[in-house]
Amino acid sequence: MQRLFLLVAVMLLSGCLTAPPKEAARPTLMPRAQSYKDLTHLPAPTGKIFVSVYNIQDETGQFKPYPASNFSTAVPQSATAMLVTALKDSRWFIPLERQGLQNLLNERKIIRAAQENGTVAINNRIPLQSLTAANIMVEGSIIGYESNVKSGGVGARYFGIGADTQYQLDQIAVNLRVVNVSTGEILSSVNTSKTILSYEVQAGVFRFIDYQRLLEGEVGYTSNEPVMLCLMSAIETGVIFLINDGIDRGLWDLQNKAERQNDILVKYRHMSVPPES
């Protein structure tokens, strides 16, 4: 009877845990947070604004902890591409290629050279137009990455049978600012942050069920929120704040003035700075 009880207990503990994947997942579009849904459902502007983004730098100086790697950075280095995507998806801005500007200029030189010597392809016979200049620039950087901001857990064990769970919160912070190309004036600036959740669940048994017979078993899993998705969410939130702030300060306007009370705009307008925990 005692052996049966132990066996049932182990099965119950293991039943609460997810089974390991049996095959690799198929390629899919990147999952997105609630901030992306808010970004893509903003009310329409009076007109889209040409914007350029050059480089969003990682100013944290943080590297992944040992034993992962001493040379891999703790945060993704793709913040520029994320910001360009967020600006375009908002339907408020028309991003202009600036990160790969040298590649674009080289390609235009090749086309012009082919046009001059008469070997140009049919699709490039029309003279090239001048590149479009931006009305504003969006600058910024990843200004902070703090690991183990908060951690904790809970567990219980009875006669060698038990389970426990632990969690850890990291935090990433981003600064975005809008710059007037004509004057260099910083029109708007915002700091946003996003927590990164990691947790672990374990269960096990360590019990002598008979003389010289030991029952031992462990099951568990860990889940780490991708830093890439958290950075993307922080950038999307920052773009929404910049749009909202620009509306309030008259930098740009809505196509329909009545939509100033749009649910998304109101939510972010009333979002206050959280107190220190």
UniProtKB/Swiss-Prot annotation:
- State the protein's name: Curli production assembly/transport component CsgG
Biological role stated in the UniProt entry: May be involved in the biogenesis of curli organelles.
Q: Does the keyword Calcium apply?
A: no
Native organism: Escherichia coli (strain K12)
Q: Which cysteines are joined by disulfide bonds?
A: none
Keywords in alphabetical order, please. Cell membrane, Lipoprotein, Membrane, Palmitate, Signal
Chief subcellular location equals: membrane
Task: Give the GO terms filed under biological process for this record.
Answer: curli assembly; protein secretion by the type VIII secretion system; protein transmembrane transport; single-species biofilm formation
Give yes or no: UniProt keyword Lyase: no
In which domain of life is the source organism classified? Bacteria
Q: Which family does it belong to?
A: Belongs to the CsgG family.
Which PROSITE patterns does the protein's record reference? PROKAR_LIPOPROTEIN
- Residues with S-diacylglycerol cysteine lipidation? C16
Sites of N-palmitoyl cysteine lipidation: C16
Entry-linked InterPro entries: Curli_assmbl/transp-comp_CsgG (IPR005534)
Gene from which the chain derives: csgG
Q: Name one GO cellular component term.
A: curli secretion complex
In which compartments does the protein localize? Cell membrane
Signal peptide span = 1-15
Task: Give membrane topology per the record.
Answer: Lipid-anchor
Q: Name one GO molecular function term.
A: identical protein binding
